[in-house]
Design a protein with these regions (language model features):
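Short, solvent-exposed loop/turn segments at the edges of secondary structure
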Residues: 1, 72-74, 98
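Bacterial N-terminal signal peptides that target proteins for export
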Residues: 1-9
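Electrostatic cytochrome c docking/interface patches
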Residues: 18-35, 47-51, 88
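Solvent-exposed, polar/charged alpha-helical surfaces in well-ordered, non-transmembrane soluble domains
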Residues: 28-32, 40, 77, 89, ...
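Flexible coil segments in periplasmic/lumen-exposed cytochrome c-class electron-transfer proteins
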Residues: 36, 44-74, 105-161
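Peptidoglycan-targeting cell-wall enzymes and recognition modules
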Residues: 72-87
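A structural feature that tracks compact, well-ordered secondary-structure segments
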Residues: 80-82, 93-94, 106-107
Length: 161
């Protein structure tokens, strides 16, 4: 192989390795954000009740435990299934859009694009697993699953209302 070809091959190999390393760093950062931002609290079955002692192989597979409040009853999506056919641009738009409670939409909207992309890349790195979450139930609808009741009770009257 001539010297110019060797140099070109070495440069290409270095670029590929650098890109792979950057991808791995994004995935590690995404895992960190998922672990520290509370994503597992709702999107991983049993995570809160087991004080986080859930294998990573079960993370972000959604849950049948609902969250009920004045908005109705919502369920944490199986993010692995959700992201399966979603591109990064769609994820960024969805993360910036309002979502039903108790999803902390303001927290997602406050994240930098780089952080949201890292979360996306981490979730995409996980094998697709699990079933879709149950469908949203509007206020007053029949709920067939266990759920947490987040309906405010005994609130004092609001000033000016």
């Amino acid at each position: 192989m001539n010297p110019t070809l060797k140099l070109a091959a070495a440069l290409v190999a270095g670029l590929v390795a650098a890109q792979a390393g950057a991808g791995d760093a994004d995935i590690r950062h995404g895992r960190y954000l998922v672990a520290t931002s509370g994503c597992n609290d709702c999107h991983t079955p049993g995570y809160m009740m087991k004080d986080g002692d859930v294998a990573e192989s079960e993370w972000l597979t959604g849950d049948v435990m609902g969250w009920q409040g004045p908005w109705g009853t919502t369920y944490p999506a199986n993010l692995r299934l959700l992201f399966k056919d979603m591109d990064e641009k769609t994820w960024l738009a969805r993360a910036r859009a309002p979502m039903r409670p108790p999803m902390p939409s303001p927290s997602l909207r406050a994240m930098r694009d780089a952080d949201l992309k890292a979360i996306y890349r981490y979730v995409k790195s996980l094998p697709v697993k699990g079933a879709p979450a149950p469908a949203y139930v509007p206020p007053g609808g029949k709920v067939a699953t266990p759920y947490f009741d987040l309906t405010p009770k005994n609130l004092p009257p609001m000033a000016g209302k």
